Swiss-Prot record:
Xref: Pfam families: SymE_toxin (PF08845)
Function of the protein: Involved in the degradation and recycling of damaged RNA. It is itself a target for degradation by the ATP-dependent protease Lon.
This protein's UniProt keywords: Cytoplasm, DNA-binding, Endonuclease, Hydrolase, Nuclease, RNA-binding
GO cellular component: cytoplasm
Residue ranges constituting the SpoVT-AbrB domain according to the UniProt record: 29-74
GO molecular function, one term: RNA binding
Protein's organism: Escherichia coli O1:K1 / APEC
Subcellular location: Cytoplasm
Annotated protein name in UniProt: Endoribonuclease SymE
Amino acid sequence: MTDTHSIAQPFEAEVSPANNRQLTVSYASRYPDYSRIPAITLKGQWLEAAGFATGTAIDVKVMEGCIVLTAQPPAAEESELMQSLRQVCKLSARKQRQVQEFIGVIAGKQKVA
């Protein structure tokens, strides 16, 4: 039961009839037996307008009679320093020590011999 002072606020639905798309489940051939498996293809400029630009990671939730696609937010850009540290991790132990010594000299913690 509603309160006597409550007023229903009209709202506009996020999904309007203009945003609806009609698709048909097609099929794709599966190698090596070439059996037909269900396939859904989505393409069009409307995908980018909806937040699904090329390269966007997508979370897929599957329920009976319903598939929900959600665009994942882009990962934060890694700083140039962190990218450099990742490169240093790939170096030999000797070169890693040299980088550590260089950082110590730059930071003023060590004296140059």
